[in-house]
Amino acid sequence: MFKLLAYIMADENTKRIIGEDVDRNLKWDHINSDSRIKRLILCLKKNDYRNVYYFRLKNANKVARALIKIENIIKPFDTTVEIVGNIKGGLLVSHCLSMVGPSEAGKNLRVGPGAVIGRMGMDFPVIGDNVYIAANATVIGGVHIGNNVIIGAGSVVVKDIPDNSVVVGNPARIIRTINESDYNEIM
């Protein structure tokens, strides 16, 4: 109940970003609904999305944050994803047990299970739009990940990755360049 009240009381910018996240998550699950609240409820039933929702409300207005704190007292969060940083709308965390901590990330970031996006010292990654970080991949340090990038499962990224690249391995290396139609199929 408090989760929905927090959404209703949130500022318009927070609602817009949550809406982008909900759209992305429902599209991924092939669910279609016209009702904004019904769509939000569908997403809140998923543990993976609920963690993203709580992350978004951390930056909401005081009333929404207070409602989420009350919810946490009544029923503590089962959070298996740590999310920090400035991340634009369309965030999709495919499974739990991930750490998402870029300095900045663009729209439509998709993170697979067990992926880690973290800092090295005080240097945080900066991630572009339409990036997929697959299962158990690691992105660390002050690297810059371009737009339309796929980072393969188990890859370790410690150097910058240009736009429209597919990278794999440890250390990650570019194996091919992709076009938009390739990318849309995977995202």
Locate the predicted segments by residue.
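Generic serine detector
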Residues: N13, D21, D29, S33-S35, ...
